[in-house]
Amino acid sequence: MKKSALLNSELSYLVATLGHTDEITICDAGLPIPDGVSRIDLALTHGVPSFIETVRVMLSESQIEGAIVATEFAEVSPELYQALVAELQCEEEKTGKVLSLTHVSHEEFKQRTESSKAVVRTGECTPYANVIFQAGVVF
């Protein structure tokens, strides 16, 4: 059995196959997932798993260089947005790498998911709780 935090086989495969600049989306239960994009559906019920739990596990297993969120996330759901920012800051401290945080409109965010390698759907039911991670390199 794996010892690391990430036990889901689909997510493990996704992380193992990420190349530099590939994008993955972690989303709430309501974000529309485009046809043709790989869907990894973790949602069990409202709030399970949570957005921030999923973010933490994904960050523990993968190196990112940037994140993209909808501007509306910070405006409508500031507490969860700040929790995401705190996780990104913690990741910067652990890795010594500066991570970019880009804000776009929700409509632009939804369009951007079309080029994600995969969309990971959580059980989160907080409005605009979505992030696109851009894969980095460990060196």
Curated annotation (Swiss-Prot):
Major localization listed first in the record, in broad terms: cytoplasm
Function: Catalyzes the interconversion of beta-pyran and beta-furan forms of D-ribose.
Active site: H20
Subunit structure: Homodecamer.
Catalytic activity: beta-D-ribopyranose = beta-D-ribofuranose
Species this protein is from: Vibrio vulnificus (strain YJ016)
Gene3D superfamilies attached to this UniProt entry: RbsD-like domain
Gene (UniProt): rbsD
InterPro entries, alphabetized: D-ribose_pyranase, RbsD-like_sf, RbsD_FucU
UniProt keyword terms in alphabetical order: Carbohydrate metabolism, Cytoplasm, Isomerase
Protein name: D-ribose pyranase
Enzyme class: isomerase
Annotated positions binding substrate: D28, H106, Y128, A129, N130
